[in-house]
């Protein structure tokens, strides 16, 4: 206050004002500072005093023909005096206004296309909803966030090639456009920007915004997707937050979100298959997200999430060197340790073999809703500083840190046996056993941990075993802080290896990730995820399995047909039939399979009894291990729509319906595709007749006249005999049965008798 008063007094004397306004600045150092170099030292000031002049702008001489000397108000727009040192004209800012209002117009069609990201941002803000402002302490942590909504995910190099090809197509230089997305974008942009008059450099900058993901390491409390980050300055201050709902979604956020869901589903499914790694790769390669191959997205998308990183590791891509435990990302910030196997006893006297980290280490722990700093020694937690959104989140972080510390009092707090299993029914490793146990109920853990009196430190308070805050006491070594812990900022990626059980290790052999770390949270993807792999058919329930199985057979009918006749065992073992087995009642699987395989064998033995529709219909049932039995079935049951539905062995049913006229198959009312029957099927060789109600008597008997064709055969009366031409030009004598008997026995005897008759 004193100094302000003093200054006021000085300013009231006219002499002071005169000195300040009239004295020239002739101190050499100051002149040097403001005049050396081309760089403007004080742009704001420069702009102010330039705009205060009458003609602060220079323009090409042609402007004198294009703009009148005075505007409608009679104000001068340009001066006849030349600009010193160039042959340009001095122009008033009013000339710009005149030009904007009355100057020539150009086509604006390209503006929304070039400045697409800006136009879209305006739309999002227009339709967004800003809610109330709340004043409260903001726990912000720095996270790496995507700052430019609506971009594709090209690498800088890929984008550069696309931009050069679109904006400067005639420039020299090798440009290789290889990826599908590069080619699509290039084609699209070239069409959009035909005859575009906007400066090429500007177009290039704008394209870069659209093609490349830009990330920054920013303090954030709340939403981290790019549509929230673009309004970060409006939604969170140091002590306030403003509620906001974006007025639109952008594809890049949708891709990130859908990628995480697809990766989680794939890892979960792979875990329960016979060879998890092979299955995972097969699924990643055959899945599309929003019409783009998942493997292409994985190569370009920097999202760090446990399931996504497992998929990346399987593809041989580098991932972040931090490791995951209990849903938190751990990054060691100092110290080191060696690992030793050690046997410990739980409170229930169960022996656990754990890998103990010997040595002093410090870690940052970052989760979705809580963060912490952890200092630990061998099997001892020294200090844990936690911050989180709420009591629940803080408790989660404390449990994970206590288990990670491997302290004896934690292991002794276990009551009951530890026998948690994963999706494939395998026991979890001891550390995850402990974690699951305490995540279910941590009361004893907190009570046994011990408490200590605390010093009053700014911004820190204690937390009691019942998770209530306190300023006097706290769980031993644990403090709650108002400040969050920043996420690990480095984008460094390391080479990792993955074993067939999807455990990811760094080059020193430390486990960074395992399927146990993959979140069980279910979400609905924003973009369509198309899993072509049969392993993922069951994700949408039994109906989807049924439809997909039949669609697969129809799509691959040409190969299936050959395998059916030449190598049926290989066909029955195809993994595409695996999901179908879950629909067949357990007790009937083996019997159905035995029955269908026998039926198929007869079709193969008796030439010409090939029946496309029937083979397709029954094929999935033949995949189960067969039981030899004399059982015959007229219908087979599948469990869909909450009950058993029947598939008729001969004929249509709501489950499996083939329309001969349209040649289309519907499964549960859904179209499953078009069938191409064999050309000779309608008039199938005589064997189908032999199969259905004829008895083979032996070799050709000339007394019964010339060999008949199949059509003539159908005119025989019961008990009548005839010679019939079969298969490879052989002729046999048959008799029409006196009664309609079992088709199956017919086919079995027919097979044997044809062989005998021919030989």
UniProtKB/Swiss-Prot annotation:
Alphabetically ordered keywords of this record: Cap snatching, Eukaryotic host gene expression shutoff by virus, Eukaryotic host transcription shutoff by virus, Host gene expression shutoff by virus, Host nucleus, Host-virus interaction, Inhibition of host RNA polymerase II by virus, mRNA capping, mRNA processing, Viral transcription, Virion
Motif Nuclear localization signal in this chain: 736-739
Gene Ontology molecular functions: RNA binding; RNA-directed RNA polymerase activity
Domain of life: Viruses
InterPro entries assigned to the protein according to its UniProt record, in alphabetical order: Flu_PB2_2nd, Flu_PB2_6th, Flu_PB2_C, Flu_PB2_CAP-bd, Flu_PB2_middle, Flu_PB2_N, INV_PB2, PB2_helical
SUPFAM superfamilies named in the record: PB2 C-terminal domain-like
Location within or outside the cell: Virion; Host nucleus
One of the GO biological process terms: DNA-templated transcription
Cellular component GO terms held in the UniProt record: host cell nucleus; virion component
UniProt site (Avian adaptation): 627
Record's keyword annotation contains Translocase: no
Protein family (similarity comment): Belongs to the influenza viruses PB2 family.
Role according to the record: Plays an essential role in transcription initiation and cap-stealing mechanism, in which cellular capped pre-mRNAs are used to generate primers for viral transcription. Recognizes and binds the 7-methylguanosine-containing cap of the target pre-RNA which is subsequently cleaved after 10-13 nucleotides by the viral protein PA. Plays a role in the initiation of the viral genome replication and modulates the activity of the ribonucleoprotein (RNP) complex.
Known partners and oligomeric status: Influenza RNA polymerase is composed of three subunits: PB1, PB2 and PA. Interacts (via N-terminus) with PB1 (via C-terminus). Interacts with nucleoprotein NP (via N-terminus).
Protein name as catalogued: Polymerase basic protein 2
Gene symbol of the encoding locus: PB2
